[in-house]
């Protein structure tokens, strides 16, 4: 019985971590928003254009501190804004 509890507890501790970050526009800048969670959710989850199919995050919201869309649970190959490799010109 103790072994069964140990195995169940071990599975609960093992978490699956997904990629998170700020999606970028064509210029490499964060996608800006202002109190518009549905817009950001659409950018992260329900995008209709073929070019945006890489954004299949489960969650998306407007990060009001940075005034930019933020995505959670993105696939590992999704490109997100990187402060060390900032391509934004504006």
Swiss-Prot record:
The keyword Metal-binding does not apply. Has the structural arrangement of an alpha-helix connected to antiparallel beta-sheets by disulfide bonds (CS-alpha/beta). Residues 1-18 form the signal peptide. Residues 19-89 form the LCN-type CS-alpha/beta domain. Expressed by the venom gland. Pfam families: Toxin_3. Keywords: Disulfide bond, Ion channel impairing toxin, Neurotoxin, Secreted, Signal, Toxin, Voltage-gated sodium channel impairing toxin. SUPFAM superfamilies: Scorpion toxin-like (SSF57095). It comes from the Eukaryota. GO terms for molecular function: sodium channel inhibitor activity; toxin activity. It is found in: Secreted. Beta toxins bind voltage-independently at site-4 of sodium channels (Nav) and shift the voltage of activation toward more negative potentials thereby affecting sodium channel activation and promoting spontaneous and repetitive firing. GO terms for cellular component: extracellular region. Disulfide bonds join 29-88, 33-62, 40-69, 44-71. InterPro entries: LCN-type_CS_alpha_beta_dom, Scorpion_toxin-like_sf, Scorpion_toxinL/defensin. This is Putative beta-neurotoxin RjAa14F. Belongs to the long (4 C-C) scorpion toxin superfamily. Sodium channel inhibitor family. Beta subfamily. Its main location: secreted.
């Amino acid at each position: 019985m103790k072994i069964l509890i140990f195995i169940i507890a071990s599975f609960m501790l093992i978490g699956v971590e997904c990629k998170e970050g700020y999606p970028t526009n064509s210029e490499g800048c964060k996608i800006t928003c202002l109190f518009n969670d549905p817009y950001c959710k659409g950018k992260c989850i329900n995008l209709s254009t073929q070019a945006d199919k890489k954004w299949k995050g489960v969650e998306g919201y407007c990060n009001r501190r940075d005034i930019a869309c933020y995505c959670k649970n993105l696939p590992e190959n999704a490109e997100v804004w990187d402060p060390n490799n900032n391509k934004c010109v504006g």
